[in-house]
């Protein structure tokens, strides 16, 4: 964590801030990445994070919350998802782990004029909004216009940020290379 406010990520104002952002990016880039593609339960995720946290701070990317298995078949989808999100939040706190949890949004935003998703559009449970430290949502205006380009302009909407500001960060997305870059 660079501790640099998000407003300075696009245009750092000091050499120290630039250096911190570069060092933070390198630290993430040098992490070992392990992909687990089989279906997981909350218990297996917890076990894996405990193992990985022995090596230091862990980043866990979970795609997506609806695929996490549950042993309790009597719960509704809402109750199941709420319980999973609460458990992931507790794992994050207990093991100093950063968890990136992918969730779906409902289609309400597609019916609005600007089509940008809002936190209230998150599917299955309000617990996603409640438990999250940060909520990021992607928006591609060209998708709704039916325009395909090699380099797309993608907005990352920071809908919630307990430790900083909310707002929009615009990135360039190169579809061919599957790469995001800061615009400009």
Q: Which sequence ranges carry the predicted segments?
A:
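Low-complexity, intrinsically disordered Gly/Pro/Thr-rich segments
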Residues: 154-157, 166-168
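A generic structural motif
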Residues: 159-161
């Amino acid at each position: 964590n660079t501790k640099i406010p998000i407003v300075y990520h696009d245009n750092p104002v000091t050499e120290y801030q630039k250096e911190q952002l570069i060092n933070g990016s390198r630290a993430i880039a040098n992490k070992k990445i392990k992909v687990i593609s089989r279906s997981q339960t909350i218990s297996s995720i917890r076990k894996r994070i405990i193992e990985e946290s022995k090596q230091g701070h862990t980043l866990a990317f979970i795609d997506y919350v609806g695929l996490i298995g549950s042993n309790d078949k009597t719960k509704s989808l809402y109750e199941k998802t709420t319980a999973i999100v609460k458990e992931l939040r507790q794992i994050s706190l207990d093991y100093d782990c950063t968890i990136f949890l992918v969730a779906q949004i409902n289609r309400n935003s597609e019916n609005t004029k600007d089509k940008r998703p809002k936190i209230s559009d998150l599917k299955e449970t309000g617990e996603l909004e409640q438990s999250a430290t940060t909520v990021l949502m992607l928006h591609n205006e060209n998708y709704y216009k039916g325009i395909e380009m090699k380099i797309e302009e993608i907005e990352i909407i920071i809908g919630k940020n307990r430790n900083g500001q909310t707002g929009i960060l615009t990135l360039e997305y190169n579809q061919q290379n599957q790469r995001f870059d800061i615009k400009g």
